Amino acid sequence: MKKRLLACILLLTLAVLPAAARADVVAPGQKPPEPAEETAAFAELYADDLVDFDPAYTDALEGPVETALWLYPGAAEPLRTLTVEGYPANELGPCYVDSAGQFWGYTGYIYGNRFVWICLSDPTGTSVESDQAVIDRVETRVTELETAQRTQLILAAVLVAAVVAVTLVLILKLRRRMR
């Protein structure tokens, strides 16, 4: 009886649970998740090199495959690995061919992981070599973006402080006139 009651409460809770509380749903007005800074920097730097999906890799993720997920092609190490089975590789995109000729596919979501790259030439990632030139470019761009964000934050703080100071001066002048 207690198990049945607990199951009913659990089902009712899941049915009533607001969409915004679930990680896989973006509610209206909610800011959607964004890729990691490194992933976004890679996409920006290599936007002209992105290609369409190659049908030769359609079955790359068919059987149970231990798959390495990467922040970007050429990264020093994979973000994590997971077992993928029957995932439609042709839904990956955009794609990228690295300097070693390996074919990469991008996905916004795969089994709880967001914004990752998969090397379709070698899903396990055993033969994937890090590309120091790519790493250097991506890290430099991430640093530039972080510096720009910091500068914007400092500028906003200075502007707010200036508005507060001007408002304080005006209030003090108004008080002196009223006396």
Residue ranges and their predicted role:
Residues 72-86:
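SH3/SH3-like (including bacterial SH3b) beta-barrel domains
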Residues 1, 145-147, 178-179:
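Short, Lys/Arg-rich N-terminal segment immediately upstream of the first membrane anchor
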Residues 83-123:
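SH3/SH3-like beta-barrel superfamily modules
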Residues 24-55, 106-146:
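Boundary regions of SH3-family modules and the immediately adjacent low-complexity/disordered segments
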Residues 163-179:
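C-terminal membrane-anchoring or membrane-association module
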Residues 113-115, 160-163:
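Short, mixed charged/polar active-site loops
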Residues 145-160:
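Juxtamembrane/start-of-transmembrane alpha-helix segments at the extracytoplasmic/lumenal side
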Residues 1-73, 92-93:
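Cross-kingdom Sec-pathway N-terminal secretion signals
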